[in-house]
């Protein structure tokens, strides 16, 4: 959102509107203004030869206004799309947390992006308490066990369990054999 404002406009463009419906209404309003300016530009340019039109200050000012309106519309479209995407993501995350299944938001966003692009990279995480959800199936997540990152390939059977269950923190080397104890005593 900040990138769009930096590139195309200013905070004055938003005029204190911060909800999605308000931003969409503002976008529609700016699109109408842009269409009206384009019509005015066509009317002003109609019938004039190119050389005569270049020297006309009124026409130049109109062109500047059209360019400014186009930049504002582009910025608003980017902002509205980002806000819409954020609200969808937030609604899904809220629904997930209402079911008492904790999922690390950063890990979840990374997995979602990889699902969209079709990428399959190993994702490293310290979040052992994250509940495995169906979106994670097919990915390899490296879970920290206190010392190293243990790669865990997520299968359908793991859904509902925690990531930490599959990355043991202790190494069990087995019970000592009884024959060794007996030999020591003798």
Curated annotation (Swiss-Prot):
A family per Pfam: Ribosomal_S19
Keyword Transport in record: no
Organism the protein comes from: Aquifex aeolicus (strain VF5)
Record keyword Mitochondrion present: no
Annotated spans, Unknown: 1-95
GO cellular component, one term: cytoplasm
Sequence similarity: Belongs to the universal ribosomal protein uS19 family.
Signal peptide location: none
Gene that specifies this protein: rpsS
Lineage start: Bacteria, Pseudomonadati, Aquificota, Aquificia, Aquificales
GO biological process: translation
Record-given protein name: Small ribosomal subunit protein uS19
Summary of the function given for this chain in its UniProt record: Protein S19 forms a complex with S13 that binds strongly to the 16S ribosomal RNA.
A GO term, aspect molecular function: rRNA binding
Keywords: Ribonucleoprotein, Ribosomal protein, RNA-binding, rRNA-binding
Residue segments, region Small ribosomal subunit protein uS19: 96-186
